[in-house]
């Protein structure tokens, strides 16, 4: 990750944020990018019933695309950290969102099968529907990250 250089924030003119990185040795070779877009998290049960919230649909920010060059160890985590920080600092003060969502790819057409959900689980994401079947019915599984615990930790660190 040390040899990566930010090469811009593509798409700012249309409101989409997309930080991009290139390898320091070759600025014309894209090392990774991430996109964010508006979404909603729909759940079968009331996700926040213990907090007295009875909704089944919640506004969210979706990780639309996340791509990294396999040679750039740690860039995927770095881009996700940027996205989480950006949503907390820039989006949440303006829009009522509490969740980040992603459709984690499960690709059974490659050997061995590729399951991106483990990457997102390490970052604290949970399955919106843990009983959702894997492919061939559906190659993506919706996952979410509740930002409230992160915000509470940040608030505690700032006051303590």
Where would I find each of the regions flagged by the language model?
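Non-catalytic substrate-recognition and accessory regions of acyl/acetyltransferase enzymes
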Residues: 1-73, 77-160
């Amino acid at each position: 990750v040390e040899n990566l250089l930010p090469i811009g924030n593509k798409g700012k003119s249309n409101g989409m944020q997309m930080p991009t990185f290139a390898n320091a040795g070759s600025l014309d070779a894209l090392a990774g990018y991430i996109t964010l877009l508006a979404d909603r998290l729909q759940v079968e049960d009331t996700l926040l019933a213990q907090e007295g919230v009875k909704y089944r649909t919640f506004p969210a920010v979706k990780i639309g695309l996340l791509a990294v060059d396999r040679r750039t160890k740690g860039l995927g985590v770095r881009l996700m950290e940027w996205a989480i920080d950006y949503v907390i600092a820039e989006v949440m003060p303006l829009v009522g969102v509490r969740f980040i969502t992603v459709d984690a790819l499960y690709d059974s057409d490659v050997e061995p099968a590729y399951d991106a959900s483990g990457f997102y689980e390490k970052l604290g994401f949970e399955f919106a529907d843990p009983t959702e079947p894997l492919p061939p019915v559906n190659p993506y599984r919706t996952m979410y990250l509740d930002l409230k615990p992160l915000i509470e930790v940040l608030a505690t660190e700032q006051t303590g």
